[in-house]
């Protein structure tokens, strides 16, 4: 189980990303359209003044149940440990254990 503070930190980052997504997108669009170097530099400065956690790159996928950051399956939103446990208990519809 991950520390609660780490899970909360990720939730906070997700809120920041959604809050500043449009502003970030508009600034990047303006930078691409800018013709002069001075104009681009001023737009880059505005982009850098946005909070660090508002960048989507800083997000990390975590398991919804345990908060584990590694061994994450995107399709289910679970880590490999929880996925295996849920699969054995038939809690994931459509998931079958393979045998050959």
From Swiss-Prot:
Main location: plastid
GO biological process, one term: translation
Keyword Ribosomal protein applies: yes
Keywords: Chloroplast, Plastid, Ribonucleoprotein, Ribosomal protein, RNA-binding, rRNA-binding
Localization per Swiss-Prot or TrEMBL: Plastid, Chloroplast
Keyword RNA-binding on entry: yes
InterPro entries cross-referenced by the UniProt entry: Ribosomal_uS14, Ribosomal_uS14_bac/plastid, Ribosomal_uS14_CS
Gene Ontology molecular function terms on file: rRNA binding; structural constituent of ribosome
Gene Ontology CC: chloroplast; small ribosomal subunit
Summary of subunit composition and partner proteins: Part of the 30S ribosomal subunit.
Entry function: Binds 16S rRNA, required for the assembly of 30S particles.
Family designation: Belongs to the universal ribosomal protein uS14 family.
NCBIfam families in the record: PRK08881.1 (NF006477)
Name assigned to this protein: Small ribosomal subunit protein uS14c
Gene encoding the protein: rps14
């Amino acid at each position: 189980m991950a520390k609660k503070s780490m899970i909360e930190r990720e939730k906070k980052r997700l809120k920041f990303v959604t809050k500043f997504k449009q502003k970030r997108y508009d600034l990047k669009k303006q930078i691409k359209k800018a013709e002069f170097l001075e104009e681009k530099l001023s737009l880059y400065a505005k982009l850098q003044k946005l909070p660090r956690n508002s960048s989507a790159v800083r997000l990390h996928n975590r398991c919804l149940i345990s908060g584990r950051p590694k061994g994450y399956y995107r399709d289910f939103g679970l880590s490999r440990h929880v996925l295996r446990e849920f699969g054995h208990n038939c809690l994931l519809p459509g998931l079958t254990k393979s045998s050959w």
